[in-house]
């Protein structure tokens, strides 16, 4: 839709907000500065890094990383330039109780949830909940440990409307200017799936480091387009499910 705010303005707003929070001591910019990806005059994609003082690194051509062309109103962005990443800490099996506060353990992203957490399967005590990392409504979790390099790094977003505690081997993606449902779908797509596989290590037990997850290249549409994409995918899923 030509009336949509371009993703370049959305990303610019994210960078401005993060620099403000960094200046106030409420957040830290990514190590080495924030990634900015743009199309050069030669039509190729370049990346630079801008630190808190506005100093820019040398340009690096990343055209070989771009998997396909996107509409003019879209942008490519590194995962850590559109959201803050927070690692979880252990909620053990023995910490799970029948009644308590909602929590998520990494194995449940493989066995219980598809692309969203609609109803929480596990609960823990108030004591464990209070010291655990938290996932806000609409935020995303990805797995850092798995059994193969295809499923590793798969994502779900929190659709419960509640704050959830989350355990170790999980990475929370926290961003207010990108839809969590779109981001989870993008990460689970083949576009990011191939990046997840290449970034993984190990055979019997497969791992994905938060440092490598930060570098995932994400196609970012305007916010309204993100909503339309999610709605259309959900329509197709409903049709397939009801067949």
Predicted regions and their residues:
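A short beta-sheet element
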Residues: 105, 127-188, 202, 207-209
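Sequence-specific dsDNA recognition surfaces
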Residues: 53, 59-65, 80-93, 107-139, ...
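Extended, domain-scale alpha-helical bundle/helix-rich regions
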Residues: 1-58
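Short, small-residue-rich loop/turn micro-motifs
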Residues: 106-110, 212, 233
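Short, well-ordered beta-strand elements within core beta-sheets of diverse protein domains
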Residues: 65-70, 127, 171-175, 214-220
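Non-catalytic DNA-recognition/assembly elements of restriction-modification systems
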Residues: 4-13, 17-20, 59-89, 219, ...
């Amino acid at each position: 839709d030509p009336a949509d705010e371009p993703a370049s303005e959305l990303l610019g707003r994210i960078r401005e907000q993060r620099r403000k929070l960094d200046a106030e001591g409420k957040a830290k910019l990514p190590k080495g500065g924030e990634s900015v990806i743009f199309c050069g005059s030669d039509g190729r994609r370049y990346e630079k890094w801008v630190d808190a003082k506005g100093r820019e690194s040398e340009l690096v051509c990343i055209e070989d990383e771009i998997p396909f062309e996107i509409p003019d109103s879209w942008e490519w962005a590194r995962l850590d330039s559109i959201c803050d990443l927070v690692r979880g800490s252990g909620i053990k099996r023995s910490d799970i109780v029948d009644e308590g506060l909602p929590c998520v353990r990494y194995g449940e992203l493989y066995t219980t949830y598809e692309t969203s957490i609609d109803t929480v399967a596990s609960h823990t005590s108030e004591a464990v909940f209070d010291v655990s990392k938290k996932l806000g409504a609409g935020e995303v979790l990805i797995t850092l440990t798995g059994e193969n390099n295809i499923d590793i790094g798969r994502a779900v977003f929190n659709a419960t409307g509640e704050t959830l505690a989350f355990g170790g081997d999980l990475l929370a993606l926290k961003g207010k200017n990108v839809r969590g449902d779109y981001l989870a779908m993008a990460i689970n797509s083949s576009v990011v799936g191939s990046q997840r596989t290449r970034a993984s290590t190990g055979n019997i037990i497969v791992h994905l480091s938060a440092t490598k997850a930060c570098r995932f290249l994400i196609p970012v549409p305007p916010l309204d387009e993100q909503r339309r994409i999610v709605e259309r995918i959900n329509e197709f899923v409903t049709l397939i499910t009801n067949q």
